[in-house]
Each structure stands twice: as structure tokens, then as C-alpha cells.
């Protein structure tokens, strides 16, 4: 008989075998802070225009080469529970603003690093949390005073492109002016009078070959497909969209046909042909000259489409079908019935084109008032185009933020240094032990210009002391000059290096909330992970759509 070994008394006695339990400052708080610091240190070197790229290979063995913090974190699949909180804060920033995810990580990491110093010299966790919350509230009071300008006209391409440059610069340094112009053209062309801008209305089509400066904007949609039939170009297109295969009706039951004479054999397929002819003729009779289908195209149906001079395009993706319906104003029909006028879409031209060596079908609106705009990106490698696409997403999201709030604050560390200066002064006036936490909160803002300086290869301490001396003289808009070879500063407003007010507001709020949440944890209780076989890797799931 096996000997029963009693469990050690205490918390472990209540839990199943294999459960872990950590408590207290040393085991829980400092461990959590260490994990968050490591995470912030990872993405800190990727901050700003001179940030380094990370090469991430995810569990599906897909390669990512990027300095976009949101992508890095999404593919890393962080497991540590405290670090996950910081990751969730950065995801919230991405959902709310679409940019500034790395700011949240770097700032939250700095807050926790400085909180550890305070805890080690004897402050209690509650005093640190209280000080951080007071300082965060003060930062939000000061932030509106730091607004240096506002966007005047969001329908002016030149003005919009100058405002988008900063967000694109951090991802594609050197190409930001060209990309900002492309994104501005795409956004302005579909910006509705109501002011409700939808980021999903800007599509990206990536075509391998050439270089980034061969990219272009098109009002309408571009698909990497070839037309099915002989017709390759249609002007003033009337489009019928079908979500079903372009084929004759097939009965669900299997049948056996008994043929007695040669004449019956001759007439057997003729009836099917006549039926298909009548169906395609009826569709052509409504005025439709382009058919888009979401399924297979039968050879006989293709023959009659060519006979009635109808252009035929096949889209496997149901998402592409939906977007096309939105672009041309069509309704997707579930059966091969002739569409009524209200169900047909309209487009100025549909044509087959060749970009590089890739065949594309273009649905184009001549007037700049279409529902969807497409940016056609060119690049030498897939990884490069993926990274450019992420820069485009940031630019489009920045435009969306500007439609909500047109205020802008100076970039390049200028806003952070001014906040640090003013919050430090405020901390001096506060009684009680919270003042130490308030001053450390102000010091945490230095992490942003410090990261920019270190990534640019200049001495961070020299730059920060220069910034403080200039800001003490009242120059609120002066930030780090990342293009200078020596530590230098310049006016961010004159250089058009501007950040959105909303982006900064939410980043400070979310980073502080995440840091405070991590500090509030004094016990970690982890159950034993569930066993069981792992799902097979590399194989598709049984219910995934199979593309024909």
C-alpha cells in the first residue's frame, strides 16, 4: 500500500497537486515588475523612426520582420499573466487609436521600473498607486495646454498628408512623404459628408515586384484574379453579383437515366444547354454586362457568357464579394435569377490589367466619390510589403482619429518633457509620501525621448538635459532632432512632427492603468495546466473553407 504523504500546511493544502502559489513583495510584485520590464525592453529598441526591426517566427512558422509593437506582441503569444496585462493595454490602444502601442509598453515599463525603486526604499504599494493616479489625472489636465495646432481642413490632400507623416515615419522612415500622400488621397476621396469615416473602406492590394515608389491609389477595388471568359474590358458596367456557382441547377438526389435510342442520347444534353442559354440570355436581357460569382464556373455557362458578350469574374472569398457589393452598390443573389435594376451594381469601368507580371481585375470609379478606395502597394519582398501595409494601417487610423478630434501636440519627445517638467513642479507642492510617486511618474516620461535618442545613436543624457533647459525657457514645442549626428533639438511644430491629442491621452491613461493593475497584485495562484493531446500542427481544420 502506498504511503500517504500529507501536504505542507498553509495555502498549498487547499489546492490540487501541481498548483503554484506566490505571495508578498519579493515573490509576486517584484516578479511581475521584472516580467513587464523585460517585455518593455524588447519593444523599446523598436521605438521611433530609427527603431530596429524584430524578426519573429510564430507557431505556424510564418516570418515577420517588423518594428510594429502591436504585430510583435500579437505573434509572441505572451504567457506571463502580468506581462499579459501590459499587452492587453497596448491592444486596447490599437483598438481605440490604431497607433501608439509601443508608447504604452515603454511608458508602462518605465512606471513599473521606477515603482520598484520606491518600493525597495520603503514606500507602500498603496502610496505608489495613489501617487500614480494623482499624477495621471494631472497629466490629463496639462495635456490640453500643450496642443500646438489643429487640423483645419480634412478634405485638403496636402494638409492631411503633412499630418499623417509622423505616424508613418516610425514604420517607414525615408518613404513617409510619398506614403502619406497616397494615404491622404485615398482617405480624402472617400471621406463622407457626415464625417463618419470607416477604416475598412481603405483596401490594400499587395503586388510583388518593382519598388515602393511604384505604388498607386485607385478609386474602386483591385483583385488579384483573371477574368474567366473572353471579355476583358467593359465601360459603364452594370454588375450582377451571385454568391452561388455559375452553373446549371443540380438536383440533390442522384438519378439514373435509361436511354433507348440514339435520338434520345442526342437530345439528352441539349435540354441542359437550352436551359443554360435561357438563363444567361435572361440575365443579359436586364442590361447586365458583368457577372461576378462566388463559386465554380461551368464550361457551358462560360460559353454562353461569351456568346452574349458578358464579362465573367470569379471571387472565391466571401469577404471580397461583400466588399465588392459595397463598392458598386449591388446585392449578392443566392440563385441564378435575372437581377432587377435595384439589385445590380454600377461601375464606370471594369477591366483586366497587368501590374508587373500579375493579372488584376479592376473595378474603377472615375469620380472621387466611391465607397471604397484601394492602395496598390509594390515591393521587392512579401515581408517588406507586409510592413508597408502596417504603415498604411497606422496612417489610415490616424486620419480616423483626426476626424474625431482635430487637436495635435508636438512629437519627438517635446510633449513628454513638458509633462515631466510640469508634473515634477506639481509634485513639489504635494504633501505626504505620494509626492515621491508623482515625481517618479514625471521621470517615467523621460523614457520616451531617451528611447528615441538611444535608437538614433546619440547620448540620451545630453539630449534630455538640453530639452529640459530649452523647456525651462518656455519653448514647449521643442523636441529631439533625430536627423542630427550630435545631440540636438528643434521646434517640432516647424518641422511638422506632430502627434494626435487623442493618441497621447489614451496612451497615458492605458499605460498608467496597466501599471497600477500590476502593482495591485500581491498574490499569484496558478492551477496546474490541463493535460490532453495537442491539436495536430500544419493541417487545416476540417471545417475550413476549401478554395477551389
Swiss-Prot record:
Enzyme class: hydrolase
Cross-link entry Glycyl lysine isopeptide (Lys-Gly) (interchain with G-Cter in SUMO2), positions: 224, 254, 260, 534, 539
Cross-link Glycyl lysine isopeptide (Lys-Gly) (interchain with G-Cter in SUMO1) mapped to chain: 459
Superkingdom, taxonomy of origin: Eukaryota
CDD domains, sorted: TCP1_theta
Entry GO terms, CC: cell body; centrosome; chaperonin-containing T-complex; cilium; microtubule; zona pellucida receptor complex
Subcellular location: Cytoplasm; Cytoplasm, Cytoskeleton, Microtubule organizing center, Centrosome; Cytoplasm, Cytoskeleton, Cilium basal body
GO molecular function: ATP binding; ATP hydrolysis activity; ATP-dependent protein folding chaperone; unfolded protein binding
Positions contributing to ATP binding: 100-102, 170-171, 412, 499, 504
Subunit structure: Component of the chaperonin-containing T-complex (TRiC), a hexadecamer composed of two identical back-to-back stacked rings enclosing a protein folding chamber. Each ring is made up of eight different subunits: TCP1/CCT1, CCT2, CCT3, CCT4, CCT5, CCT6A/CCT6, CCT7, CCT8. Interacts with PACRG. Interacts with DNAAF4. Interacts with synaptic plasticity regulator PANTS.
Family according to the record: Belongs to the TCP-1 chaperonin family.
Function: Component of the chaperonin-containing T-complex (TRiC), a molecular chaperone complex that assists the folding of actin, tubulin and other proteins upon ATP hydrolysis. The TRiC complex mediates the folding of WRAP53/TCAB1, thereby regulating telomere maintenance. As part of the TRiC complex may play a role in the assembly of BBSome, a complex involved in ciliogenesis regulating transports vesicles to the cilia.
Protein name: T-complex protein 1 subunit theta
Organism: Mus musculus (Mouse)
Amino acid at each position: 500500500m502506498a504511503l500517504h504523504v500529507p501536504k505542507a500546511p498553509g495555502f498549498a493544502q487547499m489546492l490540487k497537486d501541481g498548483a503554484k502559489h506566490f505571495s508578498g513583495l519579493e515573490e509576486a510584485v517584484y516578479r511581475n515588475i521584472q516580467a513587464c520590464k523585460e517585455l518593455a525592453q524588447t519593444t523599446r529598441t523598436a521605438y521611433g523612426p530609427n527603431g530596429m526591426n524584430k524578426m519573429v517566427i510564430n507557431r505556424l512558422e510564418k516570418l515577420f520582420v517588423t518594428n510594429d509593437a502591436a504585430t510583435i506582441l500579437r505573434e509572441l503569444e505572451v504567457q506571463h499573466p502580468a506581462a499579459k496585462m501590459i499587452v492587453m493595454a497596448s491592444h486596447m490602444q490599437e483598438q481605440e487609436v490604431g497607433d501608439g502601442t509601443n508608447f504604452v509598453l515603454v511608458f508602462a515599463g518605465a512606471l513599473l521600473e521606477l515603482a520598484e525603486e520606491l518600493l525597495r526604499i520603503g514606500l507602500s504599494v498603496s502610496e505608489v498607486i495613489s501617487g500614480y493616479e494623482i499624477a495621471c489625472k494631472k497629466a490629463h489636465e496639462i495635456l490640453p495646454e500643450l496642443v500646438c495646432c489643429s487640423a483645419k481642413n480634412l478634405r485638403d490632400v496636402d494638409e492631411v498628408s503633412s499630418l499623417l507623416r509622423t505616424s508613418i515615419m516610425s514604420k517607414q522612415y525615408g518613404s513617409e512623404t510619398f506614403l502619406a500622400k497616397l494615404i491622404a488621397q485615398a482617405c480624402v476621396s472617400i471621406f463622407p459628408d457626415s464625417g463618419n469615416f470607416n477604416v475598412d473602406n481603405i483596401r490594400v492590394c499587395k503586388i510583388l515586384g518593382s519598388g515602393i515608389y511604384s505604388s498607386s491609389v485607385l478609386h474602386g477595388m483591385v483583385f488579384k484574379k483573371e477574368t474567366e471568359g473572353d471579355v476583358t474590358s467593359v465601360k459603364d458596367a452594370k454588375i450582377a453579383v451571385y454568391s452561388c456557382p455559375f452553373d446549371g441547377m443540380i438536383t440533390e438526389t442522384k438519378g439514373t437515366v435509361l436511354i433507348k435510342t440514339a435520338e434520345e442520347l442526342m437530345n439528352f444534353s441539349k435540354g441542359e444547354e437550352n436551359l443554360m442559354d435561357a438563363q444567361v440570355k435572361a440575365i443579359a436581357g436586364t442590361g447586365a454586362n458583368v457577372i461576378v460569382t462566388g463559386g465554380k464556373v461551368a464550361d457551358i455557362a462560360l460559353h454562353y457568357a461569351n456568346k452574349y458578350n458578358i464579362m465573367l469574374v470569379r471571387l472565391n472569398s466571401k469577404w471580397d464579394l461583400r466588399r465588392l457589393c459595397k463598392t458598386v452598390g449591388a446585392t449578392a443573389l443566392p440563385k441564378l435569377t435575372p437581377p432587377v435594376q435595384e439589385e445590380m451594381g454600377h461601375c464606370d469601368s471594369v477591366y483586366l490589367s497587368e501590374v508587373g507580371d500579375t493579372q488584376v481585375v479592376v473595378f474603377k470609379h472615375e469620380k472621387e466619390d466611391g465607397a471604397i478606395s484601394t492602395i496598390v502597394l509594390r515591393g521587392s519582398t512579401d515581408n517588406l510589403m507586409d510592413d508597408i501595409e502596417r504603415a498604411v494601417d497606422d496612417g489610415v487610423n490616424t486620419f480616423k482619429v483626426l476626424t474625431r478630434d482635430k487637436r495635435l501636440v508636438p512629437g519627438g519627445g517635446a510633449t513628454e518633457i513638458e509633462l515631466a517638467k510640469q508634473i515634477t513642479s506639481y509634485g513639489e507642492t504635494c504633501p505626504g509620501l505620494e509626492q515621491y510617486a508623482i515625481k517618479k511618474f514625471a521621470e517615467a516620461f523621460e523614457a520616451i525621448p531617451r528611447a528615441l535618442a538611444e535608437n538614433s545613436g546619440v547620448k540620451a543624457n545630453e539630449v534630455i538635459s538640453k530639452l529640459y533647459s530649452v523647456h525651462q525657457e518656455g519653448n514647449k514645442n521643442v523636441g529631439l532632432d533625430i536627423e542630427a549626428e550630435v545631440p540636438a533639438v528643434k521646434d517640432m511644430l516647424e518641422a511638422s512632427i506632430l502627434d494626435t491629442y487623442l493618441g497621447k491621452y489614451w496612451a497615458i491613461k492605458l499605460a498608467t492603468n496597466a501599471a497600477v493593475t500590476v502593482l495591485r497584485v500581491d498574490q499569484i495562484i496558478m492551477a496546474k495546466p490541463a493535460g490532453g493531446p495537442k491539436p495536430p500542427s500544419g493541417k487545416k481544420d476540417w471545417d475550413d473553407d476549401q478554395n477551389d
